[in-house]
Amino acid sequence: MPPSAQDLPLGHSTGSETPIRSSVELGAVIRDQRKRLALKQLDLAGLGNTGNRFIVDLENGKPTVQLQKVLDLMDLLGLEVVVRTKASRSASAP
């Protein structure tokens, strides 16, 4: 039987951070987390009330996926987006 949303690790943060600079990198992080949770793409699609095609596109880094759907799926997987100012590359940069 596929897992339910109650089975997922909502709010259980390991404290790890991964800088994301592209849709491909974000897709890889989401794929890795889905696999860590032993979910199939179809399971995640069902839990997220979306189609399997969306999951495939997201995990493959399609840059035009719907942002709110991505955020909702990340929440289901126990992931979150944190925006912060980038550290300067060097003190002498203009």
Model-inferred region functions:
Residues N49, Q68-R84:
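DNA major-groove recognition helix of helix-turn-helix/homeodomain DNA-binding modules
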Residues L26, L37:
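Flexible coil/turn residues that form the inter-helical turn or adjacent wing/linker of helix-turn-helix
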Residues A38-V56:
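Short alpha-helical DNA-recognition segment
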Residues V29, K40, Q66-K69:
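Residues that mark the N-terminal boundary/hinge immediately upstream of a DNA-recognition element
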